[in-house]
Regions:
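Short, Lys/Arg-enriched N-terminal segments with co-localized hydrophobic residues
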Residues: 1-6
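C-terminal structural segments of small proteins and small subunits
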Residues: 59-86
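A basic, amphipathic helix-loop patch mediating RNA/tRNA/ribosome contacts
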Residues: 7-49
């Protein structure tokens, strides 16, 4: 096998457009507003497919499953990098 693709959490959040700016993603990680698989995750966490990311946006929490990891995603493709779990 060629090994799993991984990507830093802050970068994944930006490329997938879950969070528009990487600095915001970093701050969210630092403030422990982001968990991966139920555990608080730092910006340097290596995201892999199948991970469940939860992001707390004020009153709302968004929970997504990582479907794919791509270095660069066009806006149309970005949504395909994850699926929201309701």
């Amino acid at each position: 096998g060629q090994g799993e693709r991984k990507m830093r959490l802050d970068k994944y959040l930006k490329v997938s457009r879950l969070i528009k700016r990487r600095t915001v993603a970093n701050d969210a990680c630092d403030a422990a507003r982001i968990t991966v698989n139920g555990k608080s995750a730092k910006a340097s966490y290596q995201v892999k497919t199948g991970d469940i990311i939860e992001i707390a946006f004020g009153q709302r929490t968004m929970k997504v499953e990582v479907l794919e990891i791509a270095e660069h995603a066009l806006k149309a493709d970005a949504a395909g990098m994850y699926r929201e779990i309701l």
